Amino acid sequence: MSSGAGWQSQASAKPVFTEAQASALVESVFGFKVSKIQPLPSYEDQNFRVHIARGKETTDDPVEYVLKISNTESSQTPELIEMQNHVIMFLRAAGFPTASVCRTKGDNTISLISIDSGSGVKSYLVRMLTYLPGRPIAEVAISHQQLYEIGRLAAQLDKALEEFHHPKLSLFHRENFIWNLKNVPLLEKYMGALSQSRNREIVEQVIRMFKEEVMTKLSHFRECINHGDLNDHNILVDLSKSASGEGVHQVSGILDFGDMSYGYYVFEVAIVIMYMMIESTNPIQVGGHILAGFESVIPLTAVERQALFLLVCSRFSQSLVMAAYSCQLYPENKEYLMITAKTGWKHLQQLFDMGQKAVEEIWFETAKSYESEISM
């Protein structure tokens, strides 16, 4: 959902390419003739869905792509963007439903271009990925079993990334990256975006508790590379038939690796729980199913489990505070930026009203019920 830590300068950093400029980029950088192009929603970069015109000779090459233009802040770290591309290719080779990376005419995975897109000449990183079919899970009714599978997928992804090796892997140590859960205290700089209200009081309490109860235990968490943004718009599903002939939604795509950084297993499961709660009609129940799926691959330790409730609240706080702050920068993008806020504040309040003990009881009992099913 984000791609940089330099939020203070982001007001002038977001690309504002016209469709004609984007089409010209596709042709000049990648050598494709565009038949149709349409903008896609984005937090602080610019994305276009691109249809490629094919000649009379038919090929098996894809005809739909996503052109991704990074903001000027992120464009200053080309090695990090290139690393994300390498991860996408690695995971695809390992069998995960990620996009394919399109190479430029110069046989690179990214290109740095300088252009005036309306606010003076600036440099932007450009890349293109294959367009993945499917609908965001935010748009479909998700069953308990599917929540379990999503939790399992998140753990499998983190597990697979243990085998990813690259000389620049240290780039994922993004110390001041606002979207890394470890950096919840950095939210204090953005609290001015919230009016004095119960919402603000809850976030202030979350930050205080995070410093006292999570920061002191980080050394006890197991480290890994996190996707960091497995939200309900970054997981795509397609309808397929089950063995019984019923239509079921299967994961068909994993999107947006822009928030990848070193974190911890428990961070990933907390992030997934939080985002799967957003559109749920019974949000408090979600955590147990996600946790059961995740723990079928990577069981959490007692210390990690104890931190889970506060980490879910912390991710809600990150998302809600930064959405409010971003709306001040990009009021024209308010509808997209406030997706989480439509239900997020209500869910965060409910978590706090119920309290950690009551919520954990629901989550852990639900997760335990899967263990008994498996052992039968």
Curated annotation (Swiss-Prot):
Active-site positions on this chain: 229 (proton acceptor)
Pfam families documented for this protein: APH
Keywords: Cytoplasm, Kinase, Transferase
Taxonomy, superkingdom: Eukaryota
Keyword Transferase: yes
EC number in record: 2.7.1.81
GO MF, any single term: hydroxylysine kinase activity
GO cellular component entries: cytoplasm
Function comment: Catalyzes the GTP-dependent phosphorylation of 5-hydroxy-L-lysine.
The protein's name: Hydroxylysine kinase
Organism (species): Mus musculus
